């Protein structure tokens, strides 16, 4: 029998899950956890029935292409948990996958906790009704989300964001540059995304922007953290024909962000990481045209990047779809590099944001799960 079932959908969920699993094991050293997990959660002691990267698809078109496999995995993992009957289940992000699973487990009497609310405040707010059916307790990472669930009558706890606890309030840029053996001069980080589909869409775009930046700043250096060997391979293919001082770093996104002056970042958790590292950035994103059309019809907010959403303002530029051109990204990055006053204002905004999210999230999550695990 397992004590806790878990499902994390991609690299960011794997990182979030690893932190709170480690916190839980301080009080429950023999805690048995199993489910869909990535390498960091496995390292924390989770038995991976399936690897997280099997779920790492995004957008309507991509999901449709992978739908048979996703449905098969969800059916198998649902049967597994119904048979094993864990004391509780925690779904980490991946709402479209997890809510159906959670609804079936909750209906069978297994408490379901969901960690990281979907962005119902940005689009598809009607999902709150599905969440009410599926989730016994919602754990939210942003302070404004708590009231949304309170108003809907869904038990909720604001736990803060684990990344705000892990990332130092004052990152050591000099140490990171020394660790990467970078010379003096501007450093630009390129973060095209953790999913292979994102890397395929954004890598060449960012590299072309980097070429333009390098033309203006010949002493500039570029770092690109790759989430996997496959991602590094895609970047290598995108680099063909380009002459650029680029370092591809395997899985070192935090070191890259600590070292850089400015970042080009695909929308997602990495934008929050960049803000927590107090780095001015340019946010970009491309999806297939049909996906973009459907998402725009349902959008509620003018921003897509987490730093802007949290600040309720365009603190950093966003370049999406048609506006996501190498020229635009390069010009926006150069504007950051050339304006120290603007950089300082953004850094101060990021510092305020960091303090609001720094809540010792792993301990708060462990505390919220404690009633389900008292005798584990």
In which residue ranges do the predicted regions lie?
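Nucleotide-activated sugar donor-binding and catalytic core shared by glycosyltransferases
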Residues: 1-376
């Amino acid at each position: 029998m397992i004590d806790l079932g878990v499902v994390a959908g991609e690299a960011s969920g794997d990182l979030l899950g690893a932190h709170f699993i480690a916190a839980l094991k301080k009080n429950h050293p023999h805690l048995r956890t199993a489910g869909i997990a990535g390498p960091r959660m496995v390292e924390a002691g989770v038995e991976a029935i399936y690897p997280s990267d099997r779920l790492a698809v995004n957008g309507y078109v991509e999901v449709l292409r992978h739908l048979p496999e996703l449905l098969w995995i969800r059916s198998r993992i649902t049967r597994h948990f119904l048979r094993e009957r864990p004391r509780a289940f925690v779904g980490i992000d991946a709402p479209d996958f997890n809510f159906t699973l959670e609804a079936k487990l909750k209906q069978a009497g297994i408490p379901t906790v969901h960690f990281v609310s979907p962005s119902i405040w940005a689009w598809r707010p009607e999902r709150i009704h599905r969440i009410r059916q599926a989730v016994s307790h919602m754990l939210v990472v942003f302070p404004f989300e708590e009231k949304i669930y309170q108003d809907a009558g869904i038990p909720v706890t604001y736990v803060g964001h684990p990344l705000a606890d892990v990332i130092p309030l004052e990152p050591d840029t000099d140490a990171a540059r020394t660790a990467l053996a970078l010379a003096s001069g501007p450093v630009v980080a390129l973060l095209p995304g953790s999913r292979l589909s994102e890397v395929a869409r954004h890598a060449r775009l960012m590299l072309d922007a980097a070429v333009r930046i390098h033309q203006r700043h010949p002493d500039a250096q570029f770092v690109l953290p790759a989430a996997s060997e496959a991602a590094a391979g895609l970047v290598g293919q995108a680099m063909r024909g380009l002459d650029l001082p680029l370092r591809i770093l395997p899985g070192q996104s935090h070191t890259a962000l600590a070292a850089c002056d400015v970042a080009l970042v695909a929308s997602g958790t990495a934008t929050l990481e960049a803000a927590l590292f107090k780095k001015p950035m340019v946010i970009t994103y491309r999806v297939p045209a049909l996906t973009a059309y459907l998402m725009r019809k349902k959008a509620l907010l003018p921003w897509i990047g987490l730093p802007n959403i949290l600040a309720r303002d365009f603190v950093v530029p966003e370049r999406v779809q048609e506006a996501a051109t190498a020229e635009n990204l390069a010009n926006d990055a150069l504007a950051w590099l050339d304006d120290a006053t603007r950089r300082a204002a953004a850094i101060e905004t990021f510092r305020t944001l960091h303090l609001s999210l720094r809540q010792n999230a792993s301990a708060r999550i462990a505390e919220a799960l404690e009633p389900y695990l008292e005798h584990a």
